[in-house]
Amino acid sequence: MKETPKKVLVIGSGPIKIAEAAEFDYSGSQALKALKEEGIETVLVNSNVATVQTSKKFADKLYMLPVVWWAVEKVIEKERPDGIMIGFGGQTALNVGVDLHKKGVLQKYGVKVLGTQIDGIEKALSREKFRETMIENNLPVPPSLSARSEEEAIKNAKIVGYPVMVRVSFNLGGRGSMVAWTEEDLKKNIRRALSQSYIGEVLIEKYLYHWIELEYEVMRDKKGNSAVIACIENLDPMGVHTGESTVVAPCQTLDNLEYQNMRTYTIEVARSINLIGECNVQFALNPRGYEYYIIETNPRMSRSSALASKATGYPLAYVSAKLALGYELHEVINKVSGRTCACFEPSLDYIVTKIPRWDLSKFENVDQSLATEMMSVGEVMSIGRSFEESLQKAVRMLDIGEPGVVGGKIYEAKMSKVEALKYLKERRPYWFLYVAKAFKEGATIDEVYEVTGISKFFLNKIKGLVDFYETLKILKEIDEETLKLAKKLGFSDEQISKALNKSTEYVRKIRDQSNIIPVVKLIDTLAGEWPSVTNYMYLTYNGTEDDLEFSQGNKLLIVGAGGFRIGVSVEFDWSVVSLMEAASKYFDEVAVLNYNPETVSTDWDIARKLYFDEINVERVLDLIKKEKFRYVATFSGGQIGNSIAKELEENGVRLLGTSGSSVDIAENREKFSKLLDKLGISQPNWVSATSLEEIKKFVNEVGFPVLVRPSYVLSGSSMKIAYSEEELYEYVRRATEISPKYPVVISKYIENAIEAEVDGVSDGNRVLGITLEHVEEAGVHSGDATMSIPFRKLSENSVNKMRENVLSLARELNIKGPFNVQFVVKDNTPHIIELNLRASRSMPFSSKAKGINLINESMKAIFNGLDFSEDYYEPPSKYWAVKSPQFSWSQLRGTYPFLGPEMKSTGEAASFGVTFYDALLKSWLSSIPNRIPNKNGIALVYGDKNLDYLKDTAVNLVKFGLTVYSISELPLQGIETIDKTKAEELVRAKKVEIVVTDGYLKKFDYNIRRTAVDYNIPVILNGRLGYEVSKAFLDYDSLTFFEISEYGGGI
């Protein structure tokens, strides 16, 4: 008998951080839908303003608060839910659930945990309890011992024997974990590992060098019925975090006995923790024989369960929520197929490849080797009918400038076999590119296996691609059969044209003449073995006919955001989903093209049609040929859509909204600067970096510092502030590399200015705009800035000038749809620095802060015009809203934390308040590891910028009850100083509660900043923000905990 609680509290995962990303927007949204179907009132706690689930249509009540136990207790006290779901918000939600249980909050208010119970969660997440549980149930685990202190860890490592793997309990993304080859390795890093455990516990485990890592996803109901949904094979061996691994599904190298044995163990693991819902079980398999160990389990929706859901077409999160309510597997219908129940295990007639995406080039000093800690910020998923096709598609989806496994920059680089093997031994990201290069330079399968541990099955497939490509290069013309084979192996028109030394248009023309076009296949979860109809599709050249007939009519294709990276995250998925919903009123059929397995936009019940495939000109033109889309929308998915807009328009594609030529003017720095000059709109002095002589002349006129800005980039890629000639020439070189087709502009950097933005919508004549003000001064990338609505420090006169400028641009460029304009304001004069003719990163925040969906308004603007009489309209603010960045410094081994014009944050949180400080503090506390300092603790405050703000910060922290030290080498007037060595010792001893600093001081304070983030100590990297947060600490007792609509926000 199922349970029907009247009101359920769902805990979200908070802002996106490395290892806890948009997969929890997807899983949380599905859980909320499953509850709504039952007529259950839902309450959501989540501070991630960028997500789809923090829109009003998903939860009946929404609290945008820090996802921590004391804030959730306030919600429980007010809402009195019957049940709580903690399995849909990642490790963050599980930790909160365990805390609420241990502190007696759930018992006090009679709140029942739905799904897997707390004792089962603790058995799974405490390394010690998990080991004991497996041994009790005769399930194989590697030799290991747990430890709760440095001394115990060192002692147990001697017993287990080196090399050892250090695994961290109650932890996210392998943070703090490592492989220690010697006692010296262990001593150097064990304190950090213990610091990263929520319960101060690690497991010292025998390191299984070059063993194969596999994952199984299992569903289990309250009666113990189980269904194994997917087997996922990691191409990277043990020692590389699964989130860092390239993976395939279904498993490719297992024989039936291996598969069935591990399947049985998976069901036994689920039984041993009394799982209700979904979990994944990770295995290590000896490549030399039938020997396997169970490594761990996650008793919640996870990154791999989101991948499994999208790979198989089985809605794991939806089914899991139903099981948590007491349904049995046979009682739940799989809504993807619409025909089968949830006890049917999926069968695949295709191969899925997932590859992580890294952005390590944005971070100084970062360790470039893949290891036990996750550092990737996103992932892509491709679908093909052969491993080669699937892998090559996935490489292009990464959007890193590589056309496939072969034929790109790395493949054609000057690099010897020895160098390629060296990079492989170091486990550099995108290892498959170096594997191909090694084979091209003459390496053998055995040589590559020796340094990588990657199965020879996969290495042989990559070698086959190299051999085929080298054969292509000696052809003068290509015949029909060879071209067909190339497409079946996943080669793009670009790759083929490079090999033949022809144009892509030439290859496409031959394909069209020979009728070599991809076919559309359905993902039905059952490999066609059972009748079902789905809307979930991919394209392949390994087929003869389409699985569906294409209708005629008024149809729209929406280009999604692709794989997430620094600067492109869940906020663009919010824009895509918002556009899907808004566009359905104007079109007969709306389809989306996207390939990100983490997102809501790639869910089975969001779009009328979902094409899970590449985003590039070739693929969009293929789809238009089949579907005859009337329009293509490129403005909602971030930079990837804008990058192909002009080329699509040149190929006769009708773009929805602003024209591709206007987008080109805005994205091309030189063209845009000339336009501003023509319109008489103020901007920082600039010059196009066409020659060193021009640059020298310009710098002599305006003086340092100057800002180097490439075109057609997102998140400030290669954008740098240069303070000397040496820096300037180095930055120009890098910027030219990242955007070689477009000009680099050098502009005067205006110091000590306010940065502000306008998120807006235009119909070409009028503007709906929302003003956002940054807390940090100009020079900190907008994605890393703390933002306030309404504005606080800008004068009305400045804002009016900004509005005039925006209106002038909207009319000149005939902007139709969403846009974002960035300003630097100095001495009440606004200077425009950037215009983005697309949905912006801050648009979910500005929309929810004002209670008006800017994407919905965009569709009105495009088709009907804006419905107000003023030339420029800004909705009034009812209360305060503040958005804060989430950094993942601790996950990025070795990097130096600092802020500048290139974006570093991985996510964002927001909160609402009756005052600016009420909203600010809750927003800041929503980003980990931020917390209220313990009074009587120590704060370090120092820096070489914003010194007045730093001094005032120190005064506030003293008032709050902290002992504040500055550093004698960088003293602050009136503040007690200690030397740098003493400061480092205090941080290492974990006696420091918070660090507030400013400026780029890597040679001086690298150890202080790095150790602080490694030990989970809050670090504020800007003096102005430090001052505002320290002031907010003084009003900590005045925080408000209202539902979002009580603040007048939400959409």
From Swiss-Prot:
Query: Which cofactors is this protein said to need?
Result: Mg(2+); Mn(2+)
Q: Which residues bind Mg(2+) 1?
A: Q282, E296
Task: Please tell me where Mn(2+) 3 binds in this chain.
Answer: Q822, E834
**Keyword set, alphabetical order:** Amino-acid biosynthesis, Arginine biosynthesis, ATP-binding, Ligase, Magnesium, Manganese, Metal-binding, Nucleotide-binding, Pyrimidine biosynthesis, Repeat
Q: Where is this region: Carboxyphosphate synthetic domain?
A: 1-399
SMART domains noted in UniProt:
CPSase_L_D3 (SM01096)
Residues the entry annotates as binding Mn(2+) 2? E296, N298
Offer an example of a GO molecular function term for this protein.
Answer: carbamoyl-phosphate synthase (ammonia) activity
Free-text comment on the cofactor: Binds 4 Mg(2+) or Mn(2+) ions per subunit.
Give GO BP annotations, semicolon-separated: 'de novo' UMP biosynthetic process; glutamine metabolic process; L-arginine biosynthetic process
Recorded hits in InterPro entries, A to Z, give: ATP-grasp (IPR011761), ATP_grasp_subdomain_1 (IPR013815), CarbamoylP_synth_lsu (IPR006275), CarbamoylP_synth_lsu_oligo (IPR005480), CarbamoylP_synth_lsu_oligo_sf (IPR036897), CbamoylP_synth_lsu-like_ATP-bd (IPR005479), CbamoylP_synth_lsu_CPSase_dom (IPR005483), MGS-like_dom (IPR011607)
| Record GO cellular component, one term | cytoplasm
The superkingdom listed in its UniProt entry is: Archaea
Q: Reproduce the free-text note on domains from the UniProt record.
A: The large subunit is composed of 2 ATP-grasp domains that are involved in binding the 2 ATP molecules needed for carbamoyl phosphate synthesis. The N-terminal ATP-grasp domain (referred to as the carboxyphosphate synthetic component) catalyzes the ATP-dependent phosphorylation of hydrogencarbonate to carboxyphosphate and the subsequent nucleophilic attack by ammonia to form a carbamate intermediate.
Q: Gene of origin?
A: carB
Annotated residues for binding of Mn(2+) 1 = Q282, E296
Binding sites annotated in the UniProt record for ATP 2: R709, K748, I750, E755, G779, V780, H781, S782, Q822, E834
Per its record, the protein catalyses: hydrogencarbonate + L-glutamine + 2 ATP + H2O = carbamoyl phosphate + L-glutamate + 2 ADP + phosphate + 2 H(+)
Occurrences of domain ATP-grasp (ranges): 131-325, 673-863
Q: Which family does it belong to?
A: Belongs to the CarB family.
* Residue numbers spanned by region Oligomerization domain: 400-548
List the protein's name: Carbamoyl phosphate synthase large chain
Allosteric domain, as annotated region:
931-1051
Q: What's the Enzyme Commission number for this chain? A: 6.3.4.16, 6.3.5.5
Q: Where does ATP 1 bind?
A: R127, R167, G173, G174, K206, L208, E213, G239, V240, H241, Q282, E296
Record region (Carbamoyl phosphate synthetic domain): 549-930
One family from Pfam that matches here is: CPSase_L_D2
